[in-house]
Amino acid sequence: MPFLELTLRCTEATQPRYENALEDVGALAVTLLDAEADTSNEQAILEPGVGETPLWDTLVLSALFPADSNALLLLAALEAFDPELDWSSGSFRAVEDEDWERAWLDQFQPMAFGSRTWIVPWNHELPEAAQAADAAVVRLDPGLAFGSGTHPTTALCLRWLDQLAVDGLLQGQRVLDFGCGSGILALAALKLGAAEAIGVDNDPQALVATADNAERNGEQARMHVYLPPDEPVATYPIVVANILASALDALAELLAARVAAGGRIALSGILHGQEGELLQRYAEWFDDLQATQDGDWMRITGVRRA
């Protein structure tokens, strides 16, 4: 089925009005993207709080209409619905259904991290390398709201877990994924040989997503999720926290207490330039602190002092 697609730019402040107008005149679907994606001004949106829908400062908004829609009539209807909005920047084009679906799916290709960790969307066949007997494959849905491996903060943690497995430090261990989101890191740890994973997140939606992904990946028996108040008080040989730098600072004492003596921690969600203060903060409890960079993002790792 073909469609008529309208694409325009808007701001976070005006987005609700644009979307409301588009839906009123019959848009079948509306998609929002970062207008600065793949540029130095790209904004990372990490996991939202409960009831929040964070957006970028500037967005590209795409709306689909039936193919037989008249572009001029649509534009007139939009201008009549909300004449204060600028509709002049909008552009129309005809798209085929398979083009739209292909463009969407092409954004989410199988991704390899380290020597044998793979994140593969459910709608893709396993690449040949991911079919190896020792491949650690996590399957996720495209566009997952809580982390799919495409962001450098997640990639940094996945590569760290993969290296732990290479070094023989993950096999049979218990792992804490603090701020688990989709559960991607905990699931990767399980696929790499960890015995059990605990996911903690302050968003109930994230816990639902993690539990669902664990079940779909056949790991529901070894994956346990908790809100912070319900988290069992325990120590772990492996702890990973992919949250924000401000949260890593505020939770430093708690996270340090979760790492067993001689255990390892990875901290991510840190912008380049923020790592200095965190290195000093965590030096109270950790040795061998190291910072690793991926683009604008940093990962800090360390070994818990006895």
Curated annotation (Swiss-Prot):
Catalytic activity: L-lysyl-[protein] + 3 S-adenosyl-L-methionine = N(6),N(6),N(6)-trimethyl-L-lysyl-[protein] + 3 S-adenosyl-L-homocysteine + 3 H(+)
Location of the protein in the cell: Cytoplasm
Keywords attached to this entry: Cytoplasm, Methyltransferase, S-adenosyl-L-methionine, Transferase
GO biological process: methylation
InterPro entries documented for this protein: Ribosomal_L11_MeTrfase_PrmA, Ribosomal_PrmA_MeTrfase, SAM-dependent_MTases_sf
Enzyme Commission number(s) from the entry: 2.1.1.-
Keyword Transmembrane: no
Gene3D superfamilies in the record: Vaccinia Virus protein VP39
Pfam families registered for this protein in UniProt: PrmA (PF06325)
UniProt keyword ATP-binding present: no
Annotated positions binding S-adenosyl-L-methionine: T154, G179, D201, N242
Gene Ontology molecular function terms on file: protein-lysine N-methyltransferase activity
Enzyme class, spelled out: transferase
Recorded GO CC terms: cytosol
Function: Methylates ribosomal protein L11.
Family: Belongs to the methyltransferase superfamily. PrmA family.
Protein name as it appears in the record: Ribosomal protein L11 methyltransferase
